[in-house]
Amino acid sequence: MITNRKGGAMEITNIETIPGKKITTHYGVVCGSTVRSKNAFKDIGASFKNMFGGELKNYTRLLEETRQEAISRMIQQATALGANAIVNVRFATSDVAAGAAEIYTYGTAVRVE
């Protein structure tokens, strides 16, 4: 359960239904995406870390923030339609330019009771 920007609750799941609830209305596909680029200065540190192994924490943080922004945009779209849940949520990524990647999330906006 995620609270949307209007203060209401939005249930989000990667399965077709919300367990224990009935879908009463389908609003269709909703999506959210954002494109982020890497920081050139942080890339220098990441290059050294990459040579010796280990987690690239700056990239991990960047991807988490990017995912959250894409989810937030998807929730905004679903809320505007009157949905209180999003089912079948999926994520996709793609390179859109040198050093820049898109995270795209999508699902089906529904109303559940």
Regions found by a protein language model. Give the residues of each.
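Short, well-ordered alpha-helical segments
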Residues: 30, 35, 43-90
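N-terminal presequence-like segments and the immediate start of the first folded domain
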Residues: 2-42, 80, 101-113
